[in-house]
């Protein structure tokens, strides 16, 4: 898999634990910061899932 986890929205990918996943929007990747999180979000962590609009994020809501 691409180390940058560039995958389509709603798709699935297998990110490595060291992957930053900044461009990943797939539903299966929950290893790192969501692309929808604002810059400097202190709560970007595992389990973060983007929902809908770019400002709707489960870890930064």
Swiss-Prot record:
Top-rank lineage group of the source organism: Eukaryota
Acetylation recorded as keyword: yes
GO-annotated molecular function: metal ion binding; zinc ion binding
Keywords: Acetylation, Metal-binding, Metal-thiolate cluster, Phosphoprotein
Gene3D superfamilies: Metallothionein Isoform II
Residues reported to bind a divalent metal cation 4: 33-34, 44, 48
Residues involved in a divalent metal cation 6 binding: 37, 41, 44, 60
Post-translational modification N-acetylmethionine, affected residues: 1
InterPro entries assigned: Metalthion_dom_sf (IPR017854), Metalthion_dom_sf_vert (IPR023587), Metalthion_vert (IPR000006), Metalthion_vert_metal_BS (IPR018064)
Annotated a divalent metal cation 1 binding sites: 5, 7, 21, 24
Positions annotated to bind a divalent metal cation 2: 7, 13, 15, 26
Region Beta, residue ranges: 1-29
Binding site for a divalent metal cation 3: 15, 19, 24, 29
Annotated region (Alpha), positions in chain: 30-61
Any one GO cellular component localisation term in the record: cytoplasm
Example of a GO biological process term: intracellular zinc ion homeostasis
Family note: Belongs to the metallothionein superfamily. Type 1 family.
Domain observations: Class I metallothioneins contain 2 metal-binding domains: four divalent ions are chelated within cluster A of the alpha domain and are coordinated via cysteinyl thiolate bridges to 11 cysteine ligands. Cluster B, the corresponding region within the beta domain, can ligate three divalent ions to 9 cysteines.
The protein's role, per its UniProt record: Metallothioneins have a high content of cysteine residues that bind various heavy metals; these proteins are transcriptionally regulated by both heavy metals and glucocorticoids.
Subunit-level organization: Monomer.
Protein's name in the database: Metallothionein-1A
Lineage: Eukaryota, Metazoa, Chordata, Craniata, Vertebrata
């Amino acid at each position: 898999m691409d180390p940058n986890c560039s995958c389509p929205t709603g798709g699935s990918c297998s990110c490595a634990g060291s992957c930053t996943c900044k461009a990943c929007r797939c539903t299966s990747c929950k290893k790192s910061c969501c692309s929808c999180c604002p810059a400097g979000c202190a709560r970007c962590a595992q389990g973060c899932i983007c929902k809908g609009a770019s400002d709707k994020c489960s870890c930064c809501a």
